């Protein structure tokens, strides 16, 4: 399923040194789907965690360890180097851990070449509540909206109809009763 946001994900990937990427959006708008598709298509290796299912990682980030110590333990838990160019680290449901959200600043400053992307339901609500811990300026945020009509037609492989709608719109003419 093609989504317009995919091009933004490609632009983020093409930057040699980039901030962690956070996808914001309402529940069930396709955040996990599009991130999974992007990760599978664009990276050789994907390390994916869902914080709703990884209480061990949530607890790790609630400790008083230094950021370096937490990161080293995270790599051990996941059995992955995480910093290789061909690896992307996908954290789903990141809203579960406000401390891990705050730790994104560490990833940005200390591991700028690391490919890290995160998403979560109700993330925007959670961010508004905890602005003091959010790493302002250290995370790139992109909004994902529910599928629009153009994306819907593309998903249904209705490219001819889409082109005709655009043609009618640009010429300011009616489509006709049969197609409307």
PLM features: residue spans?
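Pre-Walker A adenine-sensing motif
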Residues: 1-16
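Hydrophobic positions on the alpha1 helix immediately C-terminal to the Walker A/P-loop
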Residues: 34, 38
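Conserved lysine of the Walker
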Residues: 31
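Short glycine-rich substrate-engagement loop in P-loop NTPases that contacts/grips substrate
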Residues: 53-85
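Interdomain motor-coupling "hinge/lid" segment immediately C-terminal to the ATP-binding subdomain
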Residues: 129-180
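Structural recognition of the conserved hydrophobic beta-strand(s) that form the central parallel beta-sheet
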Residues: 90, 115-121, 143, 152
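Conserved P-loop NTPase "ATPase switch" module shared by AAA+ and STAND
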Residues: 81-100
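Hydrophobic anchor at the beta1->P-loop junction of P-loop NTPases
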Residues: 23
């Amino acid at each position: 399923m093609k989504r317009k946001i995919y091009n933004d994900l490609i632009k983020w990937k093409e930057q040699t040194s980039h901030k962690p990427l956070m996808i914001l959006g309402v529940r069930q708008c396709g955040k996990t789907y599009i991130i999974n598709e992007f990760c599978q298509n664009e990276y050789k290796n994907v390390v994916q965690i869902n914080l709703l299912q990884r209480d061990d990682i949530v607890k790790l980030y609630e400790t008083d360890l230094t950021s370096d110590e937490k990161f080293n333990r995270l790599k051990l838990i996941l059995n992955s180097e995480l910093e290789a160019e061909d690896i992307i680290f996908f954290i789903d449901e990141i809203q579960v851990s406000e401390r891990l959200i705050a730790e994104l600043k560490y990833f940005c400053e200390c591991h700028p070449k690391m490919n890290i992307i995160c998403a979560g339901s109700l993330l925007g609500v959670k961010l508004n509540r905890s602005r003091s811990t959010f790493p302002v300026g250290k995370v790139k945020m992109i909004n994902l909206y529910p599928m629009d009509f153009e994306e819907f037609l593309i998903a249904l492989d209705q490219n001819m109809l889409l082109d005709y709608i655009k043609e009618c719109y640009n010429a300011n003419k009616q489509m006709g009763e049969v197609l409307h």
